[in-house]
Amino acid sequence: MAACQEVRHRMTSLSADLKNRRNAERATLIARRLAAPAADHARWSALIEASLRGGFSALEGMIVGFCWPFQGEFDARPFVTDLQGRGVRAVLPAVVAKGQPLEFREWWPGVAMSNGVYDLPVPVGSSVLTPDALLIPALGVGSQGDRLGYGGGYFDRTLVALHPKPLAVGLAFELSRIATIVPQPHDVFMDFIVTEAGIEAAVAGGLMKLSAEDCRARVAALAAERGLPRRESSGAAPAN
């Protein structure tokens, strides 16, 4: 009995230590990102958008989830709006309950919105759809494709809950690189990481640099392997 209590104590202490470490890492990374000069932020964002346009054209015909930019994150809206013109339906995440997977509501320019968690806008009254691919902002990026978010665990729970699993594309700036987030069993790794330095795929042993052509091929292969896009992805997008 005493041995079991000691093990539980060590696990609790480790969990508390890791939580404190991650929170400190988050504060550092947010401050670093917000301190980036506007000109650098714009240049990095343009490079990320160019990589997305070059490597992820295979997302056409899918339902693509993205996030409203927050605290200096890359703004995916121009890329997503361009995809919408080529048959993609776009969705934004909404928190429906603490500790639950996210709900995804269809978005287009001009859709009615209200503020949700973190005061981020979410669509009101639009269709709830299941994404085939997710463009997920990363506060920190580890060397294995592990992603540090804001601590709510919403994307981890969502990626576990959705079958087939959507393509997970982590978006970050190079200043968000960390050695590791010390992944736990509940942490879900990204399929791809895109920064201003280019595109990487998460593979056994780490991250592998991809050309735009190689990325398109890998996206298509993963989509076919997982049975994406889903049937509901085939509807026409609403007029903007």
Describe the residue ranges of each PLM region.
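Short glycine-rich anion-binding loops that position phosphate/pyrophosphate groups of nucleotides
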Residues: 69-72, 139-143
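Surface-exposed, charge/polar-rich loops and edge strands
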Residues: 2-20, 24, 31-35, 129-134, ...
